[in-house]
Amino acid sequence: YANEVAANYVGRKHPNIECRKELHTFLKRMYDAVLSAKYGRNQYDSMRANRESLPKDPFVFSCFHDYFEDYGTTQFLMNELKTACPEADTRFISFYDMKIDDEGIPLEDGSHATLLYRLHPMELLIDEQTPDNEPLGEMFLDLYEDDTFALFNPPESIILQNKSFMSLVYALYLTDQFYTKPDRDIIERYLAPSYFENDFSALDDGLYIQKEIWGREGRHVQVVQKRGDTSELYMEKLVDNYDDIVCRDSKKVMYQDFIQQKRFTHTVDCGVKDGFLTLSCFMLGDQASAVGCRFSPEEIAGTEAYFVPLLIE
């Protein structure tokens, strides 16, 4: 969305021009899949074909409303679902106000959520408790397992949130037995060599990035110099808003080869700065879609990074 706004402002084309349509198609497919699972494919198709009024099926979007980055993302996706599916009953609830009962997630009008989009790390949710010390996370997952509601981003997403997943992917790549040739080509090109903590002592001397496996927003990211059986700090990410970054506490780390980046000069709100670009790609299921770019004066990017529009000459 932001890329499109910037491109329109300067009268240029941009690489994400078809990606909004891709997002709408994905959201429509998800919407139909959730309701088909609830009512059965034949009944749902019949209701749509006969233009019957569908029962109230609230699709709830939720985050902590005072965390503005998450709030903006949540509102954007909720509005895009409404654009893709005008008939959808979309609602926003702050995590501060969300409750659960024996039937799922109750809403103010007496109904219950059919689907929930939550912008809150699953690795935190699973251990959270109520003020009475009841296992809120466990109860939430039990309700999900009982099909009282569907999840836009299901518990399986916790696998990708754990940074040691990259170590697993790379370890399997090294066996030369698990992936197809196209898969291996992708891993070799796009994934920096990644290692489990226990493998660090066997690595060659040199510079490595050390990351907490549950870290977020650059917190506790370091570059270390390995020399034999010892290592010393070479560079560390200092996060200004350390206490505001919500992530699971963990002492476990993983390592990646430190790859020197190209430097770029970029004009920002406070003048001209030298720094580094980070390119990202949004995935819709297994389909690559929109691309994005950030600029940071620091080699280890965090919340200080600037949004950079991508335009086509």
Language-model segments: which ranges?
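Domain-scale recognition of functional cores that engage charged ligands
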Residues: A2-E313
